[in-house]
Amino acid sequence: MNKFSDNEPEPSDWQEQLELLQGFTLELQSLAQEMVLLLREHNESNWEKIYSNFAEAIGNSKSNRQRLKAIDYIHSIYGGMGSWNDFYLLALGEAEEQRMSLGNAIYNLAKKMKTQIITGPKEPKRSIWQKLTGRSSRSYF
């Protein structure tokens, strides 16, 4: 399911890093939306809401801080009692296999994205004005 191979060249600057992260973001959002549809089909509204929130959070993330927050949110459902690992669809078989496959793909791609954020080229610092307006200072000249 995941379009991103482990044999990719490492980004050499922030622009390349951003393009890679945007690709991860689109794929994660797509996988999460696919999960939402599966869970909705099986009336699992609580888990559906969690994956819907993740799809929205990762899709709207504009900074590494926001990306990491979304990744930590989705990774938090994978441990402890009553976690995603303890859950299964009552309609076993193909639906449960799809749930497991999507869940694993989301977890692994989010982990890969987090590693890339931590180890790859760093995001440039933004001024308070840029943070407040969401714009680059260059867009005004």
Regions found by a protein language model. Name each.
Residues 2-53, 110, 114, 130-140:
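Short terminal alpha-helical segments
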Residues 24, 31, 57, 61-66, ...:
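Amphipathic coiled-coil alpha-helices
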Residues 74-141:
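Amphipathic alpha-helical binding modules
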Residues 38-89:
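Amphipathic alpha-helical interaction modules
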